[in-house]
Amino acid sequence: MFGKPDKMDVRCHSDAEAARVSKNAHKESRESKGAEGNLPAAFLKEPQGAFSASGAAEDCNKSKSNSAADPDYCRRILVRDAKGSIREIILPKGLDLDRPKRTRTSFTAEQLYRLEMEFQRCQYVVGRERTELARQLNLSETQVKVWFQNRRTKQKKDQGKDSELRSVVSETAATCSVLRLLEQGRLLSPPGLPALLPPCATGALGSALRGPSLPALGAGAAAGSAAAAAAAAPGPAGAASPHPPAVGGAPGPGPAGPGGLHAGAPAAGHSLFSLPVPSLLGSVASRLSSAPLTMAGSLAGNLQELSARYLSSSAFEPYSRTNNKEGAEKKALD
């Protein structure tokens, strides 16, 4: 009777000794993991199996102990990489590797048509309407709900693209308008004074604005003033003419003296509303002849200022550009 317990004790001691030896081997394998690359592969297989079993037990203990403290993670895996080192991989709680991949729903043409018509009518279909629509189309309510969510997202993206395209088009149009105004300003800038004046080949104004006939204009001004004085003088009967001289050379209906017809015709031909035109032209010509270069310089300066204002102003201020342009044109005319 005493021999059997001795054998049992020896067997238990041997089991305990084997467990202690395996633990020591496991500790030594963990301490010497830096030198595992120099050991043969046959020697590394046995500690790896022992470590995997102990690592699995440790993993279970960790998962059980940290389940309440760390609910965001559900699984910790110890793996050995290509270099032989042990690494720990923590998988998130939401990741389910065993779950099959969700299949993509394929709609028929009739289902898409009905869904699109309902979306054009109302972008949010809930409650009984969604249930009835899903029943009519032979779909689930989840499929109908997801389709409407995706359709609303697509519409928002399309609206964003359209607004961006409209902004680009408006900016392009504004840039073109600014460039057009700058081109007009460049074409209006003259090299000299004669480019600004209208081409008057004939007439008293053209002869006055051209510089070589200034002495003739002075003589014409004197003759015009004398003719106007003769027209205003009374006739031989001692009474003045009750009608003013007509414009365009037509003689007035009043009586004319011996020199009245000849005096009235030149006055009518060279006066505009009783104003002597040659004298006016003479004054204009004298001003132009006195400072033509100054006027051309001021015009060029105003046009350069106008171009600078177009460049510095925003493309979305048409009224301010119009006012600046009118002010510059008035300065140029003055």
Curated annotation (Swiss-Prot):
CDD domains: homeodomain (cd00086). One of its GO terms (cellular component) is nucleus. It is found in: Nucleus. Residues 1-34, 323-334 have a biased composition (Basic and acidic residues). Coiled coil: none annotated. Residues 1-41, 234-263, 314-334 are annotated as: Disordered. GO terms for molecular function: chromatin DNA binding; DNA-binding transcription factor activity, RNA polymerase II-specific; DNA-binding transcription repressor activity, RNA polymerase II-specific; RNA polymerase II cis-regulatory region sequence-specific DNA binding; RNA polymerase II intronic transcription regulatory region sequence-specific DNA binding; sequence-specific double-stranded DNA binding. This is Ventral anterior homeobox 1. The lineage of its organism: Eukaryota, Metazoa, Chordata, Craniata, Vertebrata. The gene is VAX1.
